[in-house]
Structure formats: structure tokens, C-alpha cells
Curated annotation (Swiss-Prot):
<feature type="binding site">
    <location>
        <begin position="216"/>
        <end position="239"/>
    </location>
    <ligand>
        <name>NADP(+)</name>
    </ligand>
</feature>
<comment type="similarity">
    <text>Belongs to the IMPDH/GMPR family. GuaC type 1 subfamily.</text>
</comment>
<dbReference type="GO" id="GO:0003920">
    <property type="term" value="F:GMP reductase activity"/>
</dbReference>
<dbReference type="GO" id="GO:0005829">
    <property type="term" value="C:cytosol"/>
</dbReference>
<keyword id="KW-0479">Metal-binding</keyword>
<keyword id="KW-0521">NADP</keyword>
<dbReference type="Pfam" id="PF00478">
    <property type="entry name" value="IMPDH"/>
</dbReference>
<dbReference type="GO" id="GO:0046872">
    <property type="term" value="F:metal ion binding"/>
</dbReference>
<dbReference type="GO" id="GO:1902560">
    <property type="term" value="C:GMP reductase complex"/>
</dbReference>
<feature type="active site" description="Thioimidate intermediate">
    <location>
        <position position="186"/>
    </location>
</feature>
<feature type="binding site">
    <location>
        <position position="181"/>
    </location>
    <ligand>
        <name>K(+)</name>
    </ligand>
</feature>
<keyword id="KW-0630">Potassium</keyword>
<dbReference type="InterPro" id="IPR015875">
    <property type="entry name" value="IMP_DH/GMP_Rdtase_CS"/>
</dbReference>
<dbReference type="InterPro" id="IPR001093">
    <property type="entry name" value="IMP_DH_GMPRt"/>
</dbReference>
<feature type="binding site">
    <location>
        <position position="183"/>
    </location>
    <ligand>
        <name>K(+)</name>
    </ligand>
</feature>
<dbReference type="InterPro" id="IPR005993">
    <property type="entry name" value="GMPR"/>
</dbReference>
<keyword id="KW-0560">Oxidoreductase</keyword>
Length: 347
């Protein structure tokens, strides 16, 4: 046993210090990034935000809606090959280039993903997702996926430390997914005591990944557009959003009605709700590490997408970054004890 005494920070612990700017308008800010990925060699341009690969976020409808904003969607792994075929038949190449195919690490997952990728060559992204990316089995699966799909861009996680980030990149991942426990419907930290404050995880993993020519996506912990800006400021190449995109018409959650008001169910992928839906219940040897919440219906996701992108542009103007690419270079974080004036929050 040992204790690390370095202070680790989450998004709520900091604000971004404003700096002199020559920008005249938020409209002057370019949010589109252009990337060429280390292993796949593929190039991609777009807004580097990803809708999370959750049942109640990463849907085909979400992918179609967010593609118009140049935003990616990691489509969850529970759609059948036939459902994928129907989606592909009704989608343009522009939509498909904004789609990630999500998979687990079982043999069945591998075979299913292979079938999906064979449906259309425009599917260039694979998202290999497990709760704990520290297992040897996971690293071996990433290497297997890289060998099988040498020209596909592979995103893999989740991890929170630099050395594991490096191992995944060396094993074939182009993008490493960073985050254990920060999600809005994740209870891993309270069920297991395991986790890492998200901003520090992003800063440390970005440093490790960029040293090898890899990239990271900050997954979890964002509750506001300001948090998205902080993640990019901390060095994230991409930011993945779950709760901020839940509860919309495109989210795919079950709708329930209480006292005449409609709500949408949103749950973590290790929650009892998810395990009952996909594997028949919680296995006797494990505990659920997610929760289910009821969200008031929020309408079309386009309004939320505009709000997030608008906040991000504004953050860039406050620090003088004319492009999103410049945000991390222009960011100075200050530690704080408060984020906002909350006097009217309960009204």
C-alpha cells in the first residue's frame, strides 16, 4: 500500500483564466479539427465531440442528428447486424463518417463487429469499450482488433493513468478513452472506491498519449458546456458526452409518465437496468455500478448541440483562441472553491 499525495482535480475544482483576445466575435472561432490517426493512417475532420456509446444516447437517430453538426456518435453495441444494415441503407456517406461502431471484447462481439464493418467501407471508427481497461485480456483484444482492421481508427478504454494509456496506444489504439467513475449515472467510485478525478486524468493521459503520437477522448464528468471547454483545455483531443445528450427525442430511452408529465429513463451501462435488459439481470458475483434516473423530456438534440458549441466558442474567445486546436495552449487553470452564484438554482 502507498499514498500518492499529489492533488488530483476534477472539472468543478477549476476555472479557466481569461486572457487578452483579438477576436471580434464568437463566430470567428473554428471548432473543426483535422486529425490523422497514428495506426490507421486515416484522416478525419469535424467537431471532436462524441455522443457516448450508451443505450440511451448512442442511437442511430442521434448519429443522424449530430452528423449535421459534424459531431461523432459512438453507436451502442446492442443493435443487430440487420438493424445496422437498415441504418446504412438509409444514411448518406456523410452521416456514416461520423459514426463509431462500438464493441465489447468477447469472441461474439468480435465476429459481430466484423460483420458490421463489412457492410460499408465508410464505417471507419471502432470503439472498444469496457469499464476496466487495465486487464491483460483487454490489451490483447485491442492488439487483435488492430491486426484484423489495420485501416480502421480504433478508440479503446477506459483507463485513467499515463502508463496504461501508453500501453493501449502501443497495442494498436489510435484514441484512448479516459475516465473511470465520473459519469452522471456511474456509481463505480462509490461501489468500489476506485476512480480518478477527471481533469487530472485528462491532463496526465494527454501528456502520455501525445508523446507517442496517440490521442485521447475525455469520457464522463461533463455537466455543462464549460466542462467541455475545460476538458479540451486540459489536452483532450475528443470529448465524449452521455448525460448532457440524454433525454432527447433521439436518445432512445423508454418514456414513462407520472402525474401527467413525461420522463425518459437514462441509465448507466453497468446499472441493474442495463444488465436486466441485455443479460437477464445482475450476476450473483457482481454488483451494479450504475443507476437509473428519470429525465424530463428535452426535445430535439439540436438545441443542446447548439448550446454546447456556443459555449465552446465563447470559451475560446475568452482566452484568445481562434481555433479549438489552440485552446489547450491558451488555457491556464485556476483552482477555485466556487463555480457559480447559486442563489436562484432552486427556483
Amino acid at each position: 500500500m502507498r499514498i500518492e499525495e499529489d492533488l488530483k482535480l476534477g472539472f468543478k475544482d477549476v476555472l479557466i483564466r481569461p486572457k487578452r483576445s483579438t477576436l471580434k466575435s464568437r463566430s470567428d472561432v473554428e471548432l473543426e479539427r483535422q486529425f490523422t490517426f497514428k495506426h490507421s493512417g486515416q484522416s478525419w475532420s469535424g467537431v471532436p465531440i462524441i455522443a457516448a456509446n450508451m443505450d440511451t444516447v448512442g442511437t442511430f437517430s442521434m448519429a443522424s442528428a449530430l452528423a449535421s453538426f459534424d459531431i461523432l456518435t459512438a453507436v451502442h453495441k446492442h443493435f443487430s447486424v440487420e438493424e445496422w444494415q437498415a441504418f446504412i441503407n438509409n444514411s448518406s456517406a456523410d452521416v456514416l463518417k461520423h459514426v463509431m461502431v462500438s464493441t465489447g471484447t468477447s469472441d461474439a462481439d468480435f465476429e459481430k463487429t466484423k460483420q458490421i464493418l463489412d457492410l460499408n467501407p465508410a464505417l471507419n471508427f471502432v470503439c472498444i469499450d469496457v469499464a476496466n481497461g487495465y486487464s491483460e485480456h483487454f490489451v490483447q483484444f485491442v492488439a487483435k482488433a488492430r491486426e484484423a482492421w489495420p485501416t480502421k481508427t480504433i478508440c479503446a478504454g477506459n483507463v485513467v493513468t499515463g502508463e496504461m494509456c501508453e500501453e493501449l496506444i502501443l497495442s494498436g489504439a489510435d484514441i484512448v478513452k479516459v475516465g473511470i467513475g465520473p459519469g452522471s449515472v456511474c456509481t463505480t467510485r462509490v461501489k468500489t472506491g476506485v476512480g480518478y478525478p477527471q481533469l487530472s486524468a485528462v491532463i496526465e493521459c494527454a501528456d502520455a498519449a501525445h508523446g507517442l503520437g496517440g490521442m485521447i477522448v475525455s469520457d464522463g464528468g461533463c455537466t455543462t458546456p464549460g466542462d467541455v471547454a475545460k476538458a479540451f483545455g486540459g489536452g483532450a483531443d475528443f470529448v465524449m458526452l452521455g448525460g448532457m445528450l440524454a433525454g432527447h427525442e433521439e436518445s432512445g430511452g423508454r418514456i414513462v409518465e407520472e402525474n401527467g408529465e413525461k420522463f425518459m429513463l437514462f441509465y448507466g451501462m453497468s446499472s441493474e437496468s442495463a444488465m436486466k435488459r441485455h443479460v437477464g439481470g445482475v450476476a450473483e458475483y457482481r454488483a451494479a455500478e450504475g443507476k437509473t434516473v428519470k429525465l424530463p423530456l428535452r426535445g430535439p438534440v439540436e438545441n443542446t448541440a447548439r448550446d454546447i458549441l456556443g459555449g465552446l466558442r465563447s470559451a475560446c474567445t475568452y482566452v484568445g483562441a481562434s481555433r479549438l486546436k489552440e485552446l489547450t495552449k491558451r488555457t491556464t487553470f485556476i483552482r477555485v472553491l466556487e463555480q457559480e452564484n447559486r442563489i436562484f438554482n432552486n427556483l
